[in-house]
């Protein structure tokens, strides 16, 4: 379609009286946001109704105007819910589409609705209302995931697995303890969500374009109607602030990073080289060429989508970094990254909350893996320290023993007491080691010995789960 073709008569736009020629069709499509900001329809109606109620209370519009506006908005809401509302590209955005339809339905009362406000404070209000509802939904789903982790952790509070550093076997832990680490991560995410909601739950409406309005408005009344905790204190900041959208995307980036770390482990654990878990078929897919394949697409996609959410954050930061006060058209570009982050986080949390309870744990495989790689070597060093040896000397002694076992292709528990003393270079100090050492060299003994708050002992894991359920 030719970029020089003009498709609009000036009168079609709310701002057209200033202009002498119609908008170029390509410009119209380039500048319109109705393709994506339809999502604001219900919160836009809610904001308009609250604004109209305040205008009537302040005698800025009549009671009849308010009644007409309420009646018209009810019909518009029904049309939207039924999929019968006709969105028009020529009207640019959700705000002017609804206002035009309202005026068509109720006449002059519809024209009075915009008294004392601008699309600048209107869209800022819509953004906060929409994001607040989204945050509340995400909070519920995040809680479901946290409960799922608690339930699985409780079931496997005594299931032994290898703990890793550098992806090398480090020390025995329990699977329940491992899951509780993710519970802690997601709990911090939940706390961040509460904090950011409290920060942005303030009303921009009343700031108008940027300087406020000459009408005797009552912003506090509108804030109460819409459930805000208060009003934005500066009209310039009210219309230009997008910190809340950036902060949500920052929260989302951290949360998705946690999801991605869990996803990476699920992918590893599901691989034949680990074989620690299995996932139900409904959370996996196959291959179009390899008949045997069962691919963990859900956690793999979650890893991939994490980068996408990072991109949403960078988009918003870049969008805002060079804007002078107050509102600029750049801010039309704030919505799609925010929508994408909300959708991605919500979908990811929902599927993980559904998937986590159905993780099939192969406890015997996990325990066997924990018994490899000299996972209890640190326990032997601690044992020697408790017998009176300095830690660095104990560390060196056990390192010699491990090296000897590697050369003999055996484990520490395969050695006799005399052989273990000799391997540690302690055969001349028999008082430092007796038969009780072997109980500590088992993975069960190692795990049970971590009897302190935050430790991996099953009793401590269960205590942590109990505290977590109380906090929830």
Swiss-Prot record:
CC terms in the record's Gene Ontology section: cytosol
Keyword Disulfide bond: no
Membrane-spanning segments: none
Alphabetic keyword roster: Amino-acid biosynthesis, Arginine biosynthesis, Cytoplasm, Lyase
Molecular function GO labels: argininosuccinate lyase activity
Keyword Cell membrane: no
PROSITE patterns: FUMARATE_LYASES
Pfam families: ASL_C2, Lyase_1
PANTHER family with a match to the protein in the record: ARGININOSUCCINATE LYASE
HAMAP family the record matches: Arg_succ_lyase
Family per record: Belongs to the lyase 1 family. Argininosuccinate lyase subfamily.
Protein name: Argininosuccinate lyase
Species the sequence originates in: Polynucleobacter asymbioticus (strain DSM 18221 / CIP 109841 / QLW-P1DMWA-1)
């Amino acid at each position: 379609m030719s970029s020089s073709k003009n498709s609009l008569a000036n009168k079609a736009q709310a701002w057209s009286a200033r202009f002498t020629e119609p908008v170029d069709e390509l410009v119209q499509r380039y500048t319109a946001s109705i393709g994506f900001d339809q999502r604001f329809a219900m919160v836009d109606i809610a904001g308009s109704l609250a604004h109209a109620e305040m205008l009537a209370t302040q005698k800025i519009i009549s009671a009849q105007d308010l009644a007409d506006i309420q009646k018209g908005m009810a019909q518009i809401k029904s049309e939207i819910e039924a999929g019968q509302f006709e969105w028009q590209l020529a009207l640019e955005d959700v705000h002017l589409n609804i206002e035009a339809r309202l005026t068509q339905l109720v006449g002059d009362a519809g024209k009075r609705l915009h008294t004392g406000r601008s699309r600048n404070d209107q869209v800022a209000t819509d953004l906060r209302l929409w994001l607040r509802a989204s945050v509340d939904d995400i909070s519920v789903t995040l809680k479901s995931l946290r409960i799922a982790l608690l339930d699985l952790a409780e079931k496997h509070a005594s299931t032994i697995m290898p703990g890793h550093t550098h992806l090398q076997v480090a020390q025995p832990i329990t699977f329940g303890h491992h899951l509780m680490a993710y519970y802690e991560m997601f709990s911090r995410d939940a706390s961040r969500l509460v904090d950011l909601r409290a920060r942005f739950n303030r009303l921009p409406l009343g700031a108008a374009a940027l300087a406020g309005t000459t009408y005797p408005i009552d912003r506090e009344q509108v804030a109460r109607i819409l459930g805000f905790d208060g009003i934005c204190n500066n009209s310039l900041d009210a219309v230009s602030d997008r910190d809340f959208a950036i902060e949500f995307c920052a929260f989302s980036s951290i949360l998705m990073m946690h999801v991605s770390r869990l996803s990476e482990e699920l992918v590893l654990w599901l691989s034949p080289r680990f074989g620690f878990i299995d996932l139900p078929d409904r959370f996996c897919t196959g291959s179009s060429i390899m008949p045997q394949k069962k691919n963990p697409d859900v956690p793999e996609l979650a890893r991939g989508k994490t980068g996408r959410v990072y991109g949403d954050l960078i988009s918003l930061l870049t969008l805002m970094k060079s804007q002078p006060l107050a509102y600029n058209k750049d801010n039309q570009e704030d919505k799609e990254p925010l929508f994408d982050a909300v959708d991605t986080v919500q979908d990811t949390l929902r599927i993980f909350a559904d998937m986590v309870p159905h993780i099939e744990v192969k406890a015997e495989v996990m325990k066997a893996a924990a018994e490899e790689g000299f996972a209890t070597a640190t326990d032997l060093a601690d044992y020697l320290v408790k017998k009176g040896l300095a830690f660095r000397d104990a560390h060196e002694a056990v390192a010699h023993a491990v090296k000897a076992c590697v050369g003999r292709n055996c484990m520490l528990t395969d050695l006799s007491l005399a052989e273990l003393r000799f391997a540690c270079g302690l055969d001349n100090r028999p008082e430092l080691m007796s038969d009780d050492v072997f109980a500590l060299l088992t993975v069960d003994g190692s795990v049970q010995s971590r009897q302190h708050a935050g430790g991996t002992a099953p009793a401590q894991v269960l205590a942590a789960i109990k505290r977590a359920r109380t906090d929830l």
